Amino acid sequence: MAIRVSHKSFLVALLLILFISSPTQARSLREVVRNRTLLVVEKSQESRKIRHEGGGSDVDGLMDMDYNSANKKRPIHNR
């Protein structure tokens, strides 16, 4: 005899499994975010140290930025 599972019970079981497993994924994502923020903080401290030691200046950063002038013509489709 084969046991026949209805679609509704299969769907309910699938949703239950997804509901139970979602908090564990959220906890692991929280750890990833913490690790990323630590990396960002470390990188910013390194860049401050380099600037303080004379390895770079703020003026160089302004020259490297992509700047569009204020009087740039708008595209035709926006007129």
UniProtKB/Swiss-Prot annotation:
The gene is GLV2. GO terms for biological process: cell differentiation; lateral root development; positive gravitropism; positive regulation of cell population proliferation; regulation of asymmetric cell division; regulation of auxin polar transport; regulation of lateral root development; regulation of protein localization. The modification Hydroxyproline is found at P75. The keyword Secreted applies. It comes from the Eukaryota. Induction: Rapidly induced by auxin. Residues 1-26 form the signal peptide. 'Golven' means irregular waves in Dutch. Belongs to the RGF family. Disruption phenotype: Reduced hypocotyl bending and dose-dependent altered root gravitropism with an impaired formation of auxin gradients, thus leading to an irregular waves root shape. Residues 27-65 form a propeptide. This is Protein GOLVEN 2.
